[in-house]
A protein has these predicted regions:
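Conserved ATP-driven motor cores of ASCE-family P-loop NTPases powering translocation/secretion/packaging/pilus
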Residues: 431-433, 440-534
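Short loop or secondary-structure boundary microenvironments that flank
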Residues: 366, 370, 417, 445, ...
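Short secondary-structure boundary/capping segments
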Residues: 181-182, 206-208, 457-461, 485-490, ...
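A broad, low-specificity signal for short, low-complexity segments enriched in glycine/proline
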Residues: 98-105, 119-131, 151-152, 321-327, ...
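Basic- and hydrophobic-enriched, low-structure N-terminal and domain-boundary segments
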Residues: 1-147, 151-154, 493, 501, ...
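P-loop NTPase motor domains
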Residues: 21, 135-439, 454, 523-544, ...
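Short alpha-helical interface patches
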Residues: 46-51, 60-114, 212-223, 272, ...
């Protein structure tokens, strides 16, 4: 922004002050020699120029002359245009960022950086960076299949091994490629396989229920994760089934604990909710159903408990409404009738409450061609964020003996093929609040509309809460337009020439103009090189760079590219669930139901 400065006029004014004084003094010398005005005095001035000298004089006439000389440039300045000018930026000031500007965000220790492109990195830990480059570490990565999202972003950042990781693993290959490297570095590797549903760690939401408040959290996570649409008219049915769902989950929560000692009598799972739903219908209105008897018995042992209250609210529904609610919830839980799914959630080996204190890498294998079971990953993330947030808060507030801030490990959630996961409850709020808990999220999508279709009105909030965007490619017009606008406008100068010819003579003219144009038009955004990417960092100009590569990383020889690489390919076996033991212990609820049916 340019305003015409006054200081050049002040300097000229000072010179004018001296010059006017000096000429006045010289003129006074001529008056003494030639008393008459006219050509004689002018001749004397020209002939005796050697007597002229610069100086400052303090007689009144010289001072007046000097003030006149000083005032003339000031008058010129006062009469000039006072508007602000931005020369070269009249239509926009956007430009490509320089490497020097990007280097400010780096940590001096290479391993403590996130890798965005061949030359751009950002320190993962703000306390190691200058205050003016401390940003949140949430990242949006956009690229088409084949643009190298995994090869140029996910793998290089896993190879940094500078934090804990929770990574979605489309196709399930990633853990094989980096698992051995991570284990050698001391990481505990967890695998939640939603592709094969076997040879996997187990995840049981009931394991993380510490109070009756968790009944609501888990119920809402399941409802949100299995929701098929956002139709507003469904809200009544959603609220109605939540009452029943809270009642059933609450029943399992209270019934599985000794009311006096709090000792866990058995570990329920979501498959037991499906068992309860199968036996909820009333065949004879005069005879209480087995489920009704179970709730009454629970209330006798634990009066006025939360599950019983929710059950009584559900009992207010009658006839078709009641049957519809049961049918909706039964449909939602029918997925747990598959033995492989039931086995996957029968116990818990994920150990979520250690993810931010113990060196851990978690891989969630999700199919990219069928999302029938992917809702389990959204439930896992919803519960995981709750568990880890509370654990981090307790550590930061000094409530966990033996732990302090220095024991809190940063967790990077890397959501490859984010649209396949399903909707995570309260995700926008989570994204905006986890920074202070040493967590960050990397969202990898193919186009903006994927996020918009999944999170509706929240997608802009999610975008705005990511300080860094890495663009690798797209064919989506809205995405092109978004990043073209984000790149900004620049000022350019255009020159046009016109010529005219006639029989006797010709003429030509040249016209120069200032115009504005996007730094990158939408089609230019789409046409970046196959090996290129655009790095957008909050409050900075866009940086155009080559993509990062696994082959440029110092640990390139520690990862595997195929099963033929026996030295680095990671093979694993996860302990199978003891079905017989589960039936004797955790399936105690099913035995109770059978006894009631016989009675």
């Amino acid at each position: 922004m340019i305003r015409k400065p006054i200081w050049p006029y002040l300097v000229v004014g000072l010179f004018s002050f001296v010059i006017f004084q000096s000429f006045y003094h010289y003129y006074q010398l001529s008056t003494a020699a030639v008393p008459f005005m006219g050509m004689l005095r002018l001749r004397w001035l020209l002939e005796h120029w050697e007597r002229f000298s610069f100086g400052v004089f303090f007689d009144s006439g010289a001072l007046y002359a000097g003030l006149i000389g000083f005032g003339l440039p000031i008058l010129v300045y006062a009469s000039m245009d006072k508007n602000l000018y931005r020369q070269g930026e009249e239509q926009g000031s956007a430009r490509f960022a320089t490497l020097k500007e990007m280097r400010r965000f780096e940590d001096v220790d290479f391993e403590k950086n996130m890798i965005f492109s061949k030359q751009v990195k950002m320190g993962l830990f703000n306390f190691r960076l200058a205050y003016n480059v401390q940003l949140n570490k949430n990242v949006i990565v956009i690229g088409l299949p084949g643009d190298g999202k995994t090869f140029t972003f996910v793998l290089p950042n896993l190879m940094q091994m500078n934090s804990n990781f929770v990574v979605t693993d489309p196709k399930g290959n990633l853990v094989h490629e980096v698992g051995k490297m991570l284990e050698k570095a001391g990481y505990a590797v967890k695998i939640f396989d939603l592709i094969r549903l076997t040879n996997s760690d187990r995840f049981n939401p009931f394991h993380y229920m510490k109070s009756e408040l968790d009944i609501d959290r888990i119920s809402e996570a399941i409802t949100e994760g299995t929701k098929k649409s956002e139709y507003a008219g469904e809200d009544f049915w959603v609220q109605a089934e939540l009452r029943l769902q809270r009642a059933l989950i609450g029943y399992l929560y209270f019934d599985s604990k000794d009311p006096e000692t709090g000792v866990q009598l058995y570990m329920p799972n979501l498959g037991h909710v499906a068992d309860l739903l199968r036996n909820i219908y009333i065949e004879d209105p005069d005879v209480p159903s087995p489920i009704e008897q179970m709730f009454e018995e629970l209330n006798e042992h634990q009066p006025n408990n939360y599950a019983y209250k929710q059950w009584k609210l559900f009992q207010n529904f009658r006839g078709d409404t009641r049957n519809s609610v049961v049918a909706i919830l039964s449909s939602r839980y029918s997925i747990f009738d598959h033995e492989d799914v039931r086995n996957l959630i029968s116990e818990d080996t994920m150990e979520m409450d250690t993810w931010n204190t113990k060196k851990t890498a978690v891989f969630i294998a999700i199919p990219d061609t069928n999302n029938a079971f992917n809702f389990l990953s959204s439930i896992l993330f919803a519960i995981g964020f709750e568990v880890l947030t509370h654990k981090a808060d307790d550590i930061l507030q000094g409530k966990v003996p033996g732990y302090s801030r220095k024991n809190l490990r940063h967790i990077q959630f890397i959501f490859d093929e984010f649209a396949q996961i399903g909707r995570i409850p309260n995700f926008a709020q989570v994204l905006s609040s986890i920074r202070s808990r040493e967590m960050s999220i990397k969202i990898i999508i193919q186009a903006v509309n994927q996020l918009e279709s999944l999170y509706k009105s929240d997608w802009k909030t999610i975008f705005n809460n990511c300080a860094t965007h890495l663009f690798l490619g797209t064919n989506d017009k809205d995405t092109m337009k978004y990043y073209s606008t984000r790149s900004g406008k620049q000022t350019i100068r255009t020159r046009s020439t016109s010529k005219s010819h006639s029989y006797r003579n010709g003429s030509s003219s040249e016209n120069k103009q200032i115009q504005g144009r996007p730094l990158l038009t939408p089609d230019e955004v789409a046409r970046i090189g196959v090996e290129e990417g655009l790095v957008f960092i909050s409050k900075q100009n866009v940086f155009r760079d080559k993509k990062a590569s696994v082959y440029d990383h110092p640990r390139k020889d520690e990862i595997a590219s195929s099963p033929e690489d026996k030295e680095n390919w990671y093979e694993y076996t996860r302990k199978g669930t003891d079905i017989d033991g589960l039936l004797l212990y955790a399936n105690d609820l099913t035995l109770q139901l059978k006894e009631l049916f016989v009675a």
